[in-house]
């Protein structure tokens, strides 16, 4: 399983790419593999304000439904509208085409995991 070293992670299986004063968020390859084929993605609206740890949407698959949690605080500046018609993009390409939201940061993100630390989380949960 691929865990890109240039991203940050949460123990709830979201990934974060910091780009200046914004961050792009999605779910990890491990998360989408556990869920199976996604059938629906519910995302926040552009302009919504998110707090760290706040529920910001959900994903549904053939196997389960799962909430999405914001790993940081800020205002949603973009959502991946392609996912409403093609949720399978998350399965096919979780770190690129399957991104979910872009957030303008209101505070420096804290408590995010490095790729190595996230790999340890995945190893614990995979057993």
Curated annotation (Swiss-Prot):
Residue ranges annotated for the Lipoyl-binding domain, each copy included: 22-104
Modified residues (N6-lipoyllysine): 63
Keyword Nucleus part of the UniProt annotation: no
Name of protein: Glycine cleavage system H protein
Annotated function: The glycine cleavage system catalyzes the degradation of glycine. The H protein shuttles the methylamine group of glycine from the P protein to the T protein.
Stated family: Belongs to the GcvH family.
Cofactor binding description: Binds 1 lipoyl cofactor covalently.
UniProt KW keywords: Lipoyl
Pfam families: GCV_H
């Amino acid at each position: 399983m691929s865990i890109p070293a240039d991203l940050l992670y949460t123990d709830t299986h979201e990934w974060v790419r910091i780009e200046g004063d914004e961050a792009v968020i999605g779910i990890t390859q491990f998360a989408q593999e556990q869920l199976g084929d996604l059938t629906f993605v519910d995302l926040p609206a552009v302009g919504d304000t998110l707090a760290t740890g706040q529920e910001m949407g959900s994903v549904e698959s053939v196997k389960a439904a799962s909430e999405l949690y914001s790993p940081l605080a800020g205002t949603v500046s973009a959502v991946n509208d392609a996912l409403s018609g093609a949720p399978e993009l998350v399965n096919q390409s979780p770190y690129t085409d399957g991104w979910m939201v872009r957030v303008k940061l209101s505070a420096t993100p804290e408590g995010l995991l490095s790729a190595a630390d996230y790999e340890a989380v995945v190893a614990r949960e995979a057993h």
